[in-house]
Amino acid sequence: MSSLDLFHYEKPTLLEFDSMVRCQGYASLAGVDEAGRGPLAGPVVAAAVILPAGIGLSEVDDSKKLTSGKRDELFEVIMANALAVGVGLSDAGVIDRINILQATLAAMKEALSLLFIKPDYVLVDGISKIPVTIPQKTIKKGDGTSLSIAAASIVAKVHRDRLMVSYDAEFPQYGFAAHKGYGCVDHLKAIAEYGPCPIHRMTFSGVKEHVKNCEG
């Protein structure tokens, strides 16, 4: 097997993947990802990021693979270098009303609408398309495939984490700064003891069992 043949069997880097998409005629490429689909409290946050073509952000990766300190560091790098960034969110009330999938897509649509540069093409993490007319491609594990999606995953995660830290000051009994709303043992115990607060997702297991107790 020649070195050229070997290249075709190797997974492209995140930057190479985006470059291949741009070579198809899309100059303005946006990556979209979300953070916070699974937690019992707080919003789901989506980010849309347009990076300059060929930018070398070698440390940018799926946000879940990075430490919080590294995410914060890369967040600043992305915000300083991106051509455009949009952040959208759906709060707990919206999630309860229309379900987490539709709330996620609504947040993604909002994030795209807040870009001051309109993208030619959108790469979306996951399997569900955003309800917009812009051409798009969904990619399973897209944050490990596309640099633009990986950047969006970091922006969404850091933005949401900072929101949850701010909620911790308002509702200190739940420990939001530590677990960011996820259903860990300490969080479940706090819900059982204090009942849900206004940012809890009342339709989610782990919360809904205590809604009547809260209302009664």
UniProtKB/Swiss-Prot annotation:
Keywords: Cytoplasm, Endonuclease, Hydrolase, Manganese, Metal-binding, Nuclease. SUPFAM superfamilies: Ribonuclease H-like (SSF53098). Endonuclease that specifically degrades the RNA of RNA-DNA hybrids. One of its GO terms (cellular component) is ribonuclease H2 complex. Belongs to the RNase HII family. PROSITE patterns: RNASE_H_2 (PS51975). Its EC number is 3.1.26.4. Its cofactor is Mn(2+); Mg(2+). Manganese or magnesium. Binds 1 divalent metal ion per monomer in the absence of substrate. May bind a second metal ion after substrate binding. GO terms for molecular function: manganese ion binding; RNA binding; RNA-DNA hybrid ribonuclease activity. Signal peptide: none annotated. Residues 27-216 form the RNase H type-2 domain. NCBIfam families: PRK00015.1-1 (NF000594), PRK00015.1-3 (NF000595). Pfam families: RNase_HII (PF01351). It comes from Geotalea daltonii (strain DSM 22248 / JCM 15807 / FRC-32) (Geobacter daltonii). The keyword Manganese applies. It is an enzyme of class 3 (hydrolase). Gene3D superfamilies: Ribonuclease H-like superfamily/Ribonuclease H. GO terms for biological process: DNA replication, removal of RNA primer; mismatch repair. It catalyses: Endonucleolytic cleavage to 5'-phosphomonoester. It is found in: Cytoplasm. This is Ribonuclease HII. A divalent metal cation binds at D33, E34, D125. Its main location: cytoplasm.
